[in-house]
Amino acid sequence: MNDKAENRKMFVVAYCKDKVGEEATQERHTHMQGHMDHVASIVDHIALAGPMYADDGETINGSMLVYKTDKIDQACEWLKGDPYYQANIWESVEIKFIKVALGDQVGGLTW
């Protein structure tokens, strides 16, 4: 393994798919400010985050958060503090590890 490969970081990704329907859309809007306040309060622990969109490029249908941790329990703790999680707007939440091989989080290329 080269020196750059040692810079690869393990992060935790949360892919959160919204429930379908007007009620879920309204819940998203109702809790948006609380969600924004929450992610702002943990911004130093987030590599990137944002809404996911349907194929039309306009309809929000979920959220993705990439946490700067290699501990799923820690990422789940941050996620459970999110008003969207607490309001149960997500139909499903998938949590996975990602080892970052390139990008500004690891100084460019790691090979």
Identify what each model region corresponds to.
Residues 1-111:
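Conserved, structured core segments of small domains
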